[in-house]
Regions:
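Non-heme Fe(II) oxygenase catalytic core, chiefly the N-lobe of the double-stranded beta-helix
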Residues: 2-235, 243-252
């Protein structure tokens, strides 16, 4: 059975003695799922998994989704390719939760590092549950019944502004109209409350004249260093994060 060691941060755990290229047994799956819910992001080293292994692992946790804007592995549309260099720098450097422009965003994301830069390239994660816990009662009451709009168009505005960008992403725009999510959600496993907004995809609070100031406060609050952990990548490292309760961003 694999071992789980909590990080020194408010979230995250390292999982060792675990070979993700092999089929997980029922007890192993349950332990991993509980650990994901509890620690919010799990880190693995030296995982030599194939595309088939990657897809099989992800499928244990629910229905897989294909990203509408990024290239994917041939024959494996559920596996997104994230690749950047000097000619193709990353456009996504804001804190975000994956694909909240969907009515039902994915439960989590499983990212494996294959080509690691000599410097930079770390990933930061931030816990939205601990951030909620630290809100004062007035803010908790104020936010409880609010809804926010999450938008693909808002999140990919830089790509859409490029020459030919709107034509290239026309299908993604059509298939992903703006959606509404509660500002405060409850995690289905832990029961913890979560501040469910992110700077990349959340465009505004529905029907509230104070939308701008509320989001400004929330973004400043959830981006604080005390809620973060940092992961330094190595070849064949894996980060598996709970998309229901954390933000993440690359460090470039």
């Amino acid at each position: 059975m694999f071992e789980i060691e909590k990080t020194k941060y408010k979230l995250g755990a390292y999982v060792s003695n675990c070979d993700l290229s092999k089929q997980l047994g029922e007890k192993e799956f349950e332990l991993l799922y509980q650990a994901l819910s509890e620690y919010e992001v799990l880190f693995f080293r030296d995982q030599h998994i194939s595309h088939e292994d990657h897809r099989r692992l992800a499928s244990l946790f629910g229905e897989m989704q294909t990203h509408p804007a990024y290239p994917t592995v041939e024959g494996f549309p559920e596996i997104t390719i994230l690749e950047n260099d000097e000619q193709n720098p990353s456009k996504i450097e804001e804190w975000h939760t994956d694909m909240t422009f969907k009515r039902n965003p994915p439960l989590g994301s499983i990212l494996i590092g294959k080509i690691i830069p000599e410097t930079g390239g770390d990933t930061l994660f931030s816990t939205l549950s601990k951030a909620y816990d630290d809100l004062n009662d007035d803010w908790k009451i104020k936010l409880e019944n609010m809804n926010a709009i999450h938008s693909f168009e808002f999140g990919f505005k830089e790509s859409l502004a490029e020459e030919g960008g709107r034509e290239r992403l026309a299908q993604a725009l059509e298939e992903n109209p703006p959606v509404s999510h509660p500002v405060i959600k409850k995690h289905p496993v832990t029961g913890r409350k979560i501040i469910f907004v992110n700077k990349l995809f959340t465009s505004h609070i529905e029907g509230d004249d104070e939308s701008g100031s509320i989001l400004k406060f929330l973004f400043e609050h959830i981006h604080q260093d005390k809620y973060q952990c940092r992961f330094s990548w190595e070849n064949n490292s894996i980060a598996f994060w709970d998309n229901r309760s954390v933000l993440h961003k690359p460090v470039n």
